[in-house]
Amino acid sequence: MNLIYTIILTIIILVLIISIKDLFFEDKIKKINKSIPSPPTIPIFGNLLQINSKDVATCFNDFYKQYGKVYRLRLGSVETVVLTGGDIIDECFNKKYRDFLKARYVKFSRYLGKDTNILHSNGDYHFLLKGVLSSQVTVRKLNNGRLEFNKYILQMFNNLNNNDEGSTMFLANDVPSQIKKLILKVVLNFTLGIEENDDINLSLFQNGSNIFKAAGLFIYSDYLPFLFPLDIKSMAKSNMISSYVFVRDYLAKKLEEVKKKEYIINGDDDGGVDTSQTPLIESYYKLYLQGLIGYDSILLSIVDIIIASVDTTSNSISFIIARLTNHQEIQSKIYEEIMSNDINNNSNNISFSDHSKYPYIISIMNETYRYYASVPLPEPNMTTEDIEVDGYKIAKGTQIYKNIRGTLISKEFWGEDALEFKPERFKTQTLNQKGLLHFGAGPRGCPGARFTECFFFTLMVLLFKNYKLQNPNDNPIDDRGDVGLSMQCKPYDALFIKRN
């Protein structure tokens, strides 16, 4: 009992100290940032209690509508600025302040990966990890069959159809889960060089989903550590820790198998194998043997890559399949474009190098990236120098959020039809055109962008060349999604009707 009283008294004293500091002292960061538009704050908490923890992205977007493209929040003790708009984000992250916004702001709940994994490391260490990944997902390697997209996609169709070649239609249950399992197979092949059985794939799928959903939780103790008791319930409910341990232990076993490969132990660069097919885990292990990265970096970075790539890519694709299942007329246009390019009936061997021949599919991909922003509010960056944005000074050490979802659905930037799904707006545009920002911006942009683009394009061609999709229910499929770190597509079924 005395211990409980001591803890309570300690918390009260800490709160009083923070309150006095907050009311009577103004640190350098707060002094520089104070001219930036901001909602009213309250002592200690700042704007923390105004944040809707269940939908942070929408909450931040509501602030943008009220306070403008550059506004300030004080989340507990953390000075924060939120940026909205393609031009402003492009200026800050790709041009004027590119070198001052390379650093990731590492929250308390992400501290495990600080200076270790690909997502939360900083400086040269981060760019070393990212560089290895980027070198393995070049367009050339992807076009040369590095990930065998076509094979895995066609296998999924056969599995959904119970390998019955004579069947003309079948019902696919929970399409988003089917897409996630498909991409998981591709990513395991890329990162580990293996194909697992269905039971292990299912366990990885379930635990990976738990981790990514939990990563989207708003953690109050990231900003005021004494609020940790408020976070315990939501963190425990998500099974985040047990799921993370499961995935990490699985990868640790796979890394032990890599360590036994003689050509790696002996320092042989290729071991008599095609280096373009080298699994990512082996490339990272070689860096470890050279003393360039830590052992934990291999495991934690592979966890990041598997979970992030599976979740974001699968949700983007699941959303557009839902949309097209509701809209047969768009499917018809896609099919016409495919067949006009498929004189020799060879599109099952489609390659990303052919994508320029499919402008309508590319316009649909671009509109999907815009309308269904896979990561509405990415992990924050941090200013490493004082900067000036849109006339406002922002201090060194400020947490910076990019309001991606708000940027992509705002009428200010996209016109009165911003809330409509309209592929025609990109009719004359190239893939991943300027202003979309769906893969982030600047040096911390997504290194797996080409992976997503290649897979997305390949699946669109193979799916709509071979099948027409129908909604088996009377009500339209709900494609609104649940908000988290990534937009989560809700489960739905679709009827696959084989084309002649």
From Swiss-Prot:
Entry keywords, A to Z: Heme, Iron, Membrane, Metal-binding, Monooxygenase, Oxidoreductase, Transmembrane, Transmembrane helix
Enzyme class, first EC level, given as a word: oxidoreductase
EC number, UniProt record: 1.14.-.-
Subcellular location: Membrane
Cofactor entry: heme
GO CC list: membrane
Cited Pfam families: p450
Membrane topology: Single-pass membrane protein
Domain of life of the source: Eukaryota
Xref: InterPro entries: Cyt_P450, Cyt_P450_CS, Cyt_P450_E_grp-I, Cyt_P450_sf
Listed PROSITE patterns: CYTOCHROME_P450 (PS00086)
Residues that span the membrane, as ranges: 4-24
Record keyword rRNA-binding present: no
UniProt: heme binding residues: 446
Gene Ontology molecular function: heme binding; iron ion binding; monooxygenase activity; oxidoreductase activity, acting on paired donors, with incorporation or reduction of molecular oxygen
Family in the record: Belongs to the cytochrome P450 family.
Name of this protein: Probable cytochrome P450 514A2
Native organism: Dictyostelium discoideum
